[in-house]
Amino acid sequence: MANPQASPILHHPQNHLSLFHFRTTTSPRSFSSLHFRKPLLFLSSSSSFSSKLQQSEQQCNNHQVRHVSTVPVEYSTPTPPESDDFLSEIDRLKSLLSKLDVSKDLRRKDAVIDADSRVRRFFSENRGGLSKVFGYLGLNSNEMFLVKCVIAAGQEHALCMNYEEAFGEEEEEYTVRSSVKNALYALVEMIERFDVNSSGYKGRREMGTVLDSEEIAHFRKFLTFLEEIEQFYDCIGGIIGYQVMVLELLHQSSKRRNTNRSQLVEESLGCQYLEMHTPSVLDLTQEEDYASQAALWGIEGLPDLGEIYPLGGAADRLGLIDSETGECLPAAMLAHCGRTLLEGLIRDLQAREFLYFKLYGKQCVTPVAIMTSAAKNNHEHVSSLCERLKWFGRGQSNFRLFEQPLVPAVSAEDGQWIVSKPFVPVSKPGGHGVIWKLAYDKGVFNWFYDHGRKGATVRQVSNVVAATDVTLLALAGIGLRYNKKLGFASCKRNAGATEGINVLMEKKNFDGKWEYGISCIEYTEFDKFDISNRSPSSNGLQADFPANTNILYVDLHSAELIGSSSNAKSLPNMVLNTKKRIEYLDQYGDYHSVMGGRLECTMQNIADNFFNKFPSRCHGSLEDKLDTYIVYNERRKVTSSAKKKKPHASAALHQTPDGALLDILRNGYDLLTECDIKLPMIEANDKYVDSPPPYLILLHPALGPLWEVSRQKFKGGSISSCSELQLEIAEFSWNNVQVDGSLIVTAENAMGSTTPNDNGEPILQYGLRCGKCKLHNVNVVNRGIDWNSKSNVYWRNDVNRLETCKIILHGNAEFEASNVTIEGHHVFEVPDGHKLKITSGNAGLSINLEALKEEVMETGSWYWNYQLNGSHIHLQQVEVSQS
């Protein structure tokens, strides 16, 4: 009978390498049995294939043909593994792991894995030419060990040539091409048994097929992939430990359906009793004075803080594609409000550093650690962006990029690795929870210490509002002030949203002691904890808890202790979410979509390692006694994410770039109305599904970033519906300005100017030669944005304008307008070292351009002086005296 698992592809003999087939015996109950998705066609059923076979015989007339089998190829319907299959496989792999764990060197480990039943069977059934193949490839002992680990883990199909695994796809259209492809499989299955002696084939290759240079490259890349898994997941047993964890989680998932959930949860968390409570929070909306004080602690502690960005996610839901190349792009490259999301993060950080300079007169450059991945060339895109923007005027030494490994995607049915082609498993990033171990492995913690840092703020790239007003500064300030280990920024949760919740965990351990701490439960685990994701009106339990936003403060030393753990603790809350479809193209370009997932862990669940122990059960308030805490603010000041593409014909704008823009506009409305500026209110999202927003307002964060600071730069006026206000400037004064149309102010030196460091890199010097703009009693009237244009993309800040009033300030240029109406289209471009004044004249505008005097070149003719007054910041506009 033809082997159902050996279907090599036929290649030309030149410049190819012979490889092997795998003839694993399968049975309907075999845990790792692999099947064709559909029956293969046979030679006997196709005259065209018979004729082609005769041609092949004529071309090979110098070669002896042993025999050709026309027996139908075996085909079996995939059978989902039963519980016993999982348990027996888990037991086998755990036994193997324990033996490997006590083996002190590679030689001993190799001896252990050679004794594994799967490995023995594999090499005994594929002994022909294997050693020669591996020798030709130049595999060293470690690479051979990795290959054996894959086999021992039951994933030898990742090494096989040209067969398909059955994952039970629900719907698949069988094309003529697919049928022909299957027929070719059968043809080649027979041809492989020929005794070939022509040029390029030496000797009898009864079990051989060939690899071309591309496939050899895939194999080499596959070895690198395996080595990264083996090294990074060493804390759980490498490749084999990864598969054990996958199978255990799948088994738990099936067991959960038939077992008391609370018992399962308590068993998995290793405790006798577990209860979740609604956590107490530090509500920044109710305690404004305390919020101001906490934010000041955050500013004051900026020299002790680092910044961490986990950017490694695949962001598949965003569907971002380069319009020119067609390449899939990572979320960090999404152009939102005129700049990439990564640029937005750095701009927010620089705004806080600018505020620190204005208060204390000192430069402060925060070191930034960025976790990337190979998904969608994430690492290359992020690196290139940083280089192109000259490291944002911060110097390359203040950035540390570290790349997370990719992990194999697995079938939801049986935990088998999903393979798109030989040596190419479908792979995804292993979740942002790998960041702590990876940071330790890559020396990121020591790098932060070398920069004198004690703590760090963590935010995700898709959240565009996390730095609004006091949220981020208060979070960090409280963590530093009270030596906390971990803090969460939280808010009200939107029912049904794909976001987790923060909870207060109460556990009774088997030793009789009690533990308490703030934790997070991801939405994918609501079912595990028996939490309903219904709307509040349906009394869903999730409505009682605040949202987890993945905005964190972390004590670096505490995080390092967890990341350096030599066990599973370094990978917090490992989960296997198999409720999504894995989509991929095979080597023939055929599309596949299967239910699956990958082993991932959650960054925020490092909190589970920071619980506080008590000898007895606690009652009443615990906040002061815990190492974990929550600050709480209005949702649109905490989280609004651009993480998924707006669905067609859908009214759901939540977590889309469109919805994120609306929240930015709502924040702008809240801020400016507090400054006595009249403007229309932003309505609910569903109002703007098919309509543009009522206006476009984008403000540079360095105008604050604290709203207490921003409010002192704006006073009175109005912004009409269908108007636009964009301010790319920090030194700005607005007094009774009316905008009916478009007003754009852009300062080249919004926060300062750059000077070269010792390496010749441009470094931003805050407060040096800033561009400045004053608008007092000014009316701006023009036709503004063409709101009827079909090509406008408002969230991208890509709009067509009919008219605008645009002020461009080069270098330290200044612009002043007072008691004037600026009507129609105008572009005022002020050169470096000059001031442009506009007032009313007899025949319209009176325009006066004059050079700045030498004594005010650095400071400007005026500036905002920031002074601390208790827990508040007071601004005073200072005119610089000139001789």
From Swiss-Prot:
Keyword Transferase: yes
Name of the gene encoding the protein in the UniProt record: UGP3
GO cellular component, one term: chloroplast
Description of what induces expression: Induced by phosphate starvation.
Entries under InterPro entries matching the protein: Nucleotide-diphossugar_trans (IPR029044), UDP-sugar_pyrophosphorylase (IPR039741), UDPGP_fam (IPR002618)
Cofactor(s), names only, from the UniProt record: Mg(2+)
Stated role: Involved in the biosynthesis of sulfolipids in the chloroplast. Catalyzes the first committed step in sulfolipid biosynthesis. Converts glucose 1-phosphate to UDP-glucose, the precursor of the polar head of sulfolipid. In addition to glucose 1-phosphate, can use galactose 1-phosphate, but with much lower activity. No uridyltransferase activity with other hexose monophosphates. Specific for UTP and cannot use ATP, CTP, and GTP.
Transit peptide: 1-72
Activity regulation info: Inhibited by pyrophosphate.
Compartment list: Plastid, Chloroplast
Listed name of the protein: UTP--glucose-1-phosphate uridylyltransferase 3, chloroplastic
Catalytic activity: alpha-D-glucose 1-phosphate + UTP + H(+) = UDP-alpha-D-glucose + diphosphate
